């Protein structure tokens, strides 16, 4: 449950009014399990909360009368903070990485640049592919178009076009984004690996395997008995 307390300027503060800070004379009270307690005088609502060892929290100050819920406010704030931190950890910060090429790019250099773009996309980032023209190369823009089109073909399984090729000054560029199917496949593989890991690990408390039996000692060599002379 999100709780926000409006201030006098129409903004919001993070902390709601609680207990004796609630100014209303009567409130619409909600119990700790979400049960409706009806409209109560503030003193009666405070007494209910005190009996349960909890707080009375104003969750909807703009309502008439204000809505207040009986809860453990300290625990509520702790859980809200924990959820916010977990949500931040799950957020993926998408960056725009740039790879630069020339209209005439050597094959080994092209392969290196394509590998780098694949890495960017695999990390959920976007890639700006830029072809820079110099001097008379500006009269052969079709070479840049061919380079970008080749990249589109080579990366069609892992990328989608977010911004189609276009010119800006002496540069022709496009922006590629990760293919959603590729990202989903990565998440599925990671999930499967995470589920398989506990199964492969030894279970706590499981009896250790008995030690291997020692190999039998070799039989002593029999020496022939000497016969009578």
Swiss-Prot record:
Keyword Cytoplasm appears in the UniProt entry: yes
Keyword Cytoplasm: yes
Keywords: Cytoplasm, Initiation factor, Protein biosynthesis
Biased composition annotated in UniProt, kind: Low complexity: 192-203
Disulfide topology: none
Source organism, top-level taxon: Bacteria
Compartments it resides in: Cytoplasm
Region (Disordered): 1-21, 184-229
InterPro entries: T_IF-3_C_sf, T_IF-3_N_sf, Translation_initiation_fac_3, Translation_initiation_fac_3_C, Translation_initiation_fac_3_N
Biased composition (Pro residues): 204-221
GO biological process, one term: ribosome disassembly
Single GO MF annotation: ribosome binding
An annotated GO cellular component: cytosol
Task of the protein: IF-3 binds to the 30S ribosomal subunit and shifts the equilibrium between 70S ribosomes and their 50S and 30S subunits in favor of the free subunits, thus enhancing the availability of 30S subunits on which protein synthesis initiation begins.
Record-stated family: Belongs to the IF-3 family.
Oligomer status and interactors: Monomer.
Protein name: Translation initiation factor IF-3
Organism: Anaeromyxobacter sp. (strain Fw109-5)
Lineage per the UniProt record: Bacteria, Pseudomonadati, Myxococcota, Myxococcia, Myxococcales
Gene that produces this protein: infC
């Amino acid at each position: 449950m999100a709780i926000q307390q409006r201030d006098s300027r129409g903004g919001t503060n993070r902390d709601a009014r609680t207990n004796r800070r609630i100014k209303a004379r009567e409130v619409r009270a909600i119990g700790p399990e979400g049960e409706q307690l009806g409209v109560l005088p503030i003193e009666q609502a405070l007494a209910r909360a005190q009996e349960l060892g909890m707080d009375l929290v104003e969750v909807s100050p703009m309502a008439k009368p204000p809505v207040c819920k009986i809860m453990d406010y300290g625990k509520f704030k702790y859980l809200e903070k924990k959820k916010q931190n977990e949500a931040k950890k799950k957020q993926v910060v998408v960056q725009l990485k740039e790879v630069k090429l020339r209209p005439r790019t050597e094959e080994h250099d092209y392969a290196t640049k394509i590998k780098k773009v694949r890495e960017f996309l695999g990390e959920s980032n976007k890639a700006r592919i830029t072809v820079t023209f110099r001097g008379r190369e500006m009269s052969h823009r079709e070479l840049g178009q061919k380079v970008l089109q080749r990249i589109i073909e080579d990366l069609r399984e892992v990328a989608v076009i977010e911004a189609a090729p276009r010119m800006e000054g002496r540069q022709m560029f496009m922006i590629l984004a990760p293919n959603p199917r590729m990202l989903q496949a990565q998440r599925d593989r990671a999930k499967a690996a995470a589920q398989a890991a506990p199964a492969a690990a030894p279970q706590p408390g499981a009896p250790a395997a008995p030690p291997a039996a020692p190999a039998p000692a070799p039989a002593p060599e029999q020496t022939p008995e000497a016969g009578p002379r």
